Amino acid sequence: MKSTFALVFGILMVIAHLSFADEKVLCFDNSEETLNKEIKLFEQCGVTKDNANEENFNEAYICVLEKMEVLDENNQIVIEKFKETEKTEIVNKEEELMAAVDECAENKPTAEPKEFIQCYDEKVDKLCPDDKDIFEEDMEE
């Protein structure tokens, strides 16, 4: 009886592990509302599903930051404002992502947008690879 229970329990654990292995772990809210809001901002800044590439995405990202009111009068990213905005969409790995923000900003209160975006984007890709896949799939639709 014990061995039957152990066998059934073991099989259930393997099934549970396999079913969770395929699930994507997202760092950011990927609700339709949030994705549509982000896509709309990028479209307002000139990036659409038809012309999206890494170069114009980075340029548009600066425009998006301006629309989100996280740039100062010198067009530098105000890190605390950026963090506040970012935290509203983070669902996992907040501590790691905020550490990435600080690292990319070199622990300064403001940062130059292009360098910061490139650094932060690379760190997000490493920390949250499934998020990039979701956003790219949504841009393609």
From Swiss-Prot:
The record's family statement is: Belongs to the scoloptoxin-17 family.
The entry's comment on post-translational modification says: Contains 3 disulfide bonds.
Which of UniProt's keywords are assigned here? Disulfide bond, Secreted, Signal, Toxin
By what name is this protein known?
A: U-scoloptoxin(17)-Er3a
Lineage from the top down? Answer: Eukaryota, Metazoa, Ecdysozoa, Arthropoda, Myriapoda
Q: What GO molecular function terms would the record report? A: odorant binding; toxin activity
Listed GO cellular component terms? extracellular region
Q: Which residues form the signal peptide?
A: 1-21
Entries under SUPFAM superfamilies matching the protein: Insect pheromone/odorant-binding proteins
Q: Where does it mainly reside? A: secreted
Q: In which tissues is it expressed?
A: Expressed by the venom gland.
Where is the protein situated, by its record's location annotation? Secreted
